[in-house]
């Protein structure tokens, strides 16, 4: 177990030292809330890393989507190579929760596709928290959903030591109890195999390393770690902890106690439904719940066992579920990145879940205890916070009102200024925009255009293409993987212009962009609020030659505030640069895609389907094998966009076999 130690050729500069000192002082005073108000490109992540290093506490970093969580995880892994940095997001590639539509009498069964790689990372995250303190977990908002009870999880962990008196069969029984499966043929994560006096286990938190227990009679003679693929022995271990294969694993005693309580709740609910003459609902509930009870009794779990988690945990009705936060020690540190977006997400989670559960309970598909398999309410989330730092370029009212300390980070280490803002009339905006686009392209840069509607984005893109501009659009109908591809292609120069709506705000760091155009900037509303405008302006803050054009006939209150704030920052930045002799430099970004180190703008796709047209069947098979290996490696390194791209290419190649 080590201490947090940053590895970086950079030292805090500009506003960073002062911001670090201000936040540290506030946290050490015992203040619960603090805010880092940092402009785009000011090195907020590096400031966070320095605070973690100084405080030496287990840390949870909350991001508002998987993509930004992966980006942050990648950056913190680079800052802390000697420490544990984990990634905890929803493990569903696809998720359709169970639901009932009374109007059409349609019940939709739960349907989900679980990403095994992400499930492994989730187990790796929770097990790390039980083993050491130098742990950073970067999570999406899904971490406020119910997870298994950490006390039960810890209690079920199997501790094995060299020289321990332990029968082999006793360990096997315990492994089955914590949901490991015996499989002597397809040996994979969460399974074990037995060969004479050898017991091989692949823990739930890894797929590449196994644990070999060697017995001499009833004594553990040797514990060794081995490579699952090659069988090579990697080293000797004196002690090993085997964590449960599921976060919802429960002991036999807990299961036996819980079954009686589930049966009691069923009887009470059936009486209630029968008294309301809901006979069909009562019959349905009896049938479904009895099936679950039998499955739990025989197998120790059932499909949808999380709906009984309140009873399994021994919690009172209405009490908050156990979540990832409960796996942290009490003195943990919480960072909420892009807090102006993340906190509203946390607030909205509970209401959406409750409305769906109401229908399921009312119509006899679930017992009322299903209500307590839910995300945290916002006030419950607040109570679980120890000390938190909100991180945003545009903190909302909640952050500003609650924070006992606010540190501002306006100076960028690169000396870059906030962009110049030009206001132009709406009349003739498209023709003027075309002229600006041509001028920007001639300098080798890219353009972002933000519109108010999806239709306008599509029409404008179509018009630009007709004029010979390499343009594309991006809006909410485009999934994450396609979004990554579009951004990569923009950076590679496949496109010069990207048109979008509100997706052009947080997390789009493209140094090649030298022009951001905001159409209909004077139309008040969510997409043209002060916060939205400042975030959109920030997209141009990565290039020393960039500017922002607002097309508007009137200057709205939001525009005035956004322009005033940008000018204030420019003044501070200019004075600092003049005082220290700094010349603004465009960010030379070692390009990661929005997720971990998928080298984008410096190299186009290593392989292309076009190049495979002349291959023989044997060569195609060989290429599929190579792609598959690379895809697994990319997924392991959190390069999910690259993995998805390879997956698509494998599918196309299979069509050529």
From Swiss-Prot:
Disulphide-bonded residues: none
Pfam family membership, one: ResIII
Subcellular location(s) per record: Cytoplasm
Domain Helicase ATP-binding intervals: 25-182
UniProt cross-references to InterPro entries, sorted A to Z: Helicase/UvrB_N (IPR006935), Helicase_ATP-bd (IPR014001), Helicase_C-like (IPR001650), P-loop_NTPase (IPR027417), UVR_dom (IPR001943), UVR_dom_sf (IPR036876), UvrB (IPR004807), UvrB_inter (IPR041471)
Origin: domain of life: Bacteria
Subunit structure: Forms a heterotetramer with UvrA during the search for lesions. Interacts with UvrC in an incision complex.
Domain statement: The beta-hairpin motif is involved in DNA binding.
Name used for this protein in its record: UvrABC system protein B
Gene from which this protein is expressed: uvrB
């Amino acid at each position: 177990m080590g201490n947090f130690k940053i590895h970086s050729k950079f030292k805090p500069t500009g506003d960073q030292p002062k911001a670090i000192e201000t936040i540290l002082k506030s946290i050490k005073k015992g203040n619960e809330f603090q805010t880092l108000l940092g402009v785009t490109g000011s090195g907020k992540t590096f400031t966070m890393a320095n605070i973690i290093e100084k405080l030496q506490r287990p840390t949870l970093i909350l991001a508002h989507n998987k993509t930004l969580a992966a980006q942050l995880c990648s950056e913190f892994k680079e800052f802390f190579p000697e420490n544990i940095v984990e990634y905890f997001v929803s493990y569903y590639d696809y998720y359709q929760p169970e639901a009932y539509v009374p109007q059409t009498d349609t019940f939709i069964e739960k349907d989900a596709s679980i990403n095994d790689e992400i499930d492994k990372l989730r187990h790796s995250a929770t097990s790390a928290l039980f083993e050491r303190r130098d742990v950073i977990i970067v999570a999406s908002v899904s971490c406020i959903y119910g997870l298994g009870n950490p006390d039960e999880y810890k209690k079920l962990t199997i501790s094995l030591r060299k020289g321990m008196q332990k029968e082999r069969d006793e360990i096997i029984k315990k492994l089955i109890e914590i949901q490991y499966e015996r499989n002597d043929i397809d040996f994979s994560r969460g399974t074990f195999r037995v060969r004479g006096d050898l017991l091989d286990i692949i823990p739930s938190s890894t797929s590449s390393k196994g644990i070999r227990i060697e017995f001499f009679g009833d004594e553990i003679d040797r514990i060794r770690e081995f490579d699952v693929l090659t069988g090579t022995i990697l080293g000797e271990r004196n002690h090993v902890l085997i964590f449960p294969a599921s976060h919802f694993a429960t002991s036999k005693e807990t299961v036996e106690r819980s079954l009686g309580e589930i049966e009691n709740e069923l009887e009470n609910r059936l009486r209630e439904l029968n008294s309301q003459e809901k006979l069909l609902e009562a019959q349905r509930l009896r049938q479904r719940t009895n099936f679950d009870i039998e499955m739990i009794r025989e197998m120790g779990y059932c499909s949808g066992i999380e709906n009984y988690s309140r009873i399994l945990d021994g919690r009172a009705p209405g009490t908050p579920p156990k979540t990832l936060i409960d796996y942290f020690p009490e003195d943990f540190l919480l960072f909420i990145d892009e807090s102006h977006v993340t906190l509203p997400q946390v607030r909205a989670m509970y209401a959406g879940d409750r409305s769906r559960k109401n229908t399921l309970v009312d119509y006899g598909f679930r017992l009322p205890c299903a209500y307590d398999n839910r995300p945290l309410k916002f006030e419950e989330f607040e109570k679980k916070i120890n000390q938190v730092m909100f991180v945003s370029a545009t903190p909302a009212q909640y952050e500003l009102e609650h924070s006992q300390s606010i540190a501002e980070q306006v100076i960028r280490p690169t000396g870059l200024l906030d962009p110049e803002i030009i206001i132009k009339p709406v009349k003739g905006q498209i023709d003027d925009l075309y002229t600006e686009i041509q001028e920007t392209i001639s300098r080798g840069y890219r353009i972002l255009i933000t519109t108010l509607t999806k239709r306008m984005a599509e029409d404008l893109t179509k018009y630009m293409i007709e004029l010979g501009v390499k343009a594309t659009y991006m809006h909410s109908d485009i999934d994450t993987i396609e979004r990554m591809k579009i951004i990569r292609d923009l950076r590679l120069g496949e496109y010069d212009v990207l048109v979008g709506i509100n997706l052009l705000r947080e997390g789009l760091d493209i140094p090649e962009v030298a022009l951001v155009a905001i159409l209909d900037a004077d139309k008040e509303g969510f997409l043209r609020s002060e916060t939205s405008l400042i975030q959109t302006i920030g997209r141009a803050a990565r290039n020393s030659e960039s500017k922002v054009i607002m097309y508007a006939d009137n200057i709205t209150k939001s525009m005035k505030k956004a322009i005033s704030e940008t000018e204030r920052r420019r003044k501070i930045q200019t004075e600092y640069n003049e005082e220290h002799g700094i010349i603004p430099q465009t960010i030379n970004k070692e390009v990661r895609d929005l997720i971990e180190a998928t080298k984008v703008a410096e190299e186009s796709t290593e392989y292309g389907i076009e190049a495979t047209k002349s291959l023989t069947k044997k060569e195609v098979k060989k290429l599929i094998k190579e792609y598959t290996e690379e895809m697994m490696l990319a997924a392991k390194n959190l390069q999910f966009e690259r993995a998805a791209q390879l997956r698509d290419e494998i599918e196309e190649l299979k069509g050529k076999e």
